[in-house]
């Protein structure tokens, strides 16, 4: 079966997010009242697997090996 997978990769909450801070400052300059902005990545893919659990495990392995940097980021996986 083919499963649609959505992966969210975000900076660790303990770390400064310079891109988020820049956007937060720019929005404030434009009059928007937005705070605690974090900028990350959204990855959408299809995985061929026997089950939803196998698709999740496959996506998790891809994240650990390539799609995220564990020193600076965390990830969340949603198999649809």
Region annotations inferred by a language model:
Residues 2-42, 46, 51-80:
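Long, contiguous binding/interaction regions
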């Amino acid at each position: 079966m083919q499963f649609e997978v959505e992966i969210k990769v975000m900076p660790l909450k303990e770390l400064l997010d310079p891109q988020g801070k820049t956007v937060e400052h720019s929005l404030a300059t434009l009059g928007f009242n937005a705070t605690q902005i974090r900028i990350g990545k959204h990855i959408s893919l299809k995985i061929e697997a026997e089950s939803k659990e196998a698709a999740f495990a496959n996506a998790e392995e891809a994240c650990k090996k390539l799609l995220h940097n564990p020193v600076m980021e965390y990830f969340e996986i949603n198999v649809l």
